Amino acid sequence: YLEDFGDIFLPENKNSKESIFAVQTSDYEDDHTTYGRANWSIMLNGCWGMWSCGWDFHKPSQNLVNAFKTENGLPMFEHYNDKIDYPVNGQVSTQKWDPRLFHTVGMPTFPYKYESEYMQTVANSRTPNTYGYYTSLKEVPQRSKGETFNGSWQAFATADYVFRYTDVMLMRAEALVELNRLDEAQDIINDIRQRAANSISKHIDYAADMC
């Protein structure tokens, strides 16, 4: 699999060794068509005010953000949702987070999809009083890469994954659990978790102290 979790969701890696089965898309500049064969299912997920037609759909919930809390390097299975928490860029906190949060959820005060020239603010939420200030990151490219649809509406050529390599690894781990081969299953799960723990320096070094 790819060494950094964040690389999975960048368009340039959409057919990497991480991808087992994915719905294919293309940019109009790559396939020489008028409009490309974009992923229309995610066309409205661009961050409000960040893209030419970002409608801020597919909003991450506070419950999802809370689920990324960690304690001593492990998920907080029982008390993660006891109170509302969220990281703030540059603010010291005793609460630690799974690095995958910063690859998954766009949050005010942080770079949008790793790019410091595009900082996300509270103004980048279309309906904050209803749905909050978070935005989804996995479905969109970096802002500097631009949109991939040559028309009045935005669309992206990001991959629509059905199975990733790590999904297959987890299926194997689950089968090993059923066979009572728990040590082997644990090794696979820990391998995946270690990849997540290491996915800091390349893209989200600004969040290193929070993980």
Residue locations for each model-derived region?
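Acidic/polar-rich alpha-helix caps and helix-coil junctions
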Residues: 1-39, 74-211
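Active-site-adjacent helix-turn-beta-strand microarchitecture at beta-sheet edges
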Residues: 70
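Short, cationic low-complexity segments
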Residues: 37-67, 123-132
